[in-house]
UniProtKB/Swiss-Prot annotation:
Keyword Lyase assigned: no
UniProt note: domains: Has three domains with a flexible linker between the domains II and III and assumes an 'L' shape. Domain III is highly mobile and contacts RuvB.
Ranges where the record places region Domain II: 64-142
Region Domain I, annotated ranges: 1-63
Region annotated Domain III, chain positions: 153-201
Primary residence: cytoplasm
Protein name: Holliday junction branch migration complex subunit RuvA
GO molecular function terms attached to this record: ATP binding; four-way junction DNA binding; four-way junction helicase activity
Domain of life: Bacteria
Amino acid sequence: MISHFSGTVSAAGPTWVVLDNHGVGIKVLCPPATAASARINQDMSLHTSLVVREESLTLYGFVEADDRDAFELVQTASGVGPKLAAAIMSVLDAAQLATAITEEDDATLCRVPGIGRKGAAKMILELKDKVAALAPRGASASGATHVAAPWREQVAEGLVGLGWSTKDAEKAVDKVVALKEADPAMSIGNLMRAALRSLAR
């Protein structure tokens, strides 16, 4: 298992980055906020999960180790594959996911595209006894984020990458300005999730 990967960003898209390590470029799928924070020719380190299929090997990467662990945990629920797990981690972080499941908050889970009431209830039932494993450790990959561009631009780029129009993305960014002002240290990932929640209303 590849649990951690570091390299120089050689390319990036809405939901992926290519990290060059000694001349070998590895494509890593990641949440839009993470991809938006990537800057060409800058170093990036991600906590990763390798998904093995008969015809493919896919590497998913996360800034926080807890989010990587949550990505793997939700896939133990029936009907949840890597793509849906990645969608979940694009909207909720590990702590928010654990809280939603523990408190049986299906409304929060339903904010994730692809999860309905029945699916949320099923996830809660199957994962409620497992979420204790998501206790925050405060461990983040060294050098994983490089805020070279304004946070507004990064969040907007991430939303557009998810399919929202530029206009909707800008409106969503405007709605989270107060959060950033109240907590200047708030991460791009958390701002992205807040913006997504405002769009889901």
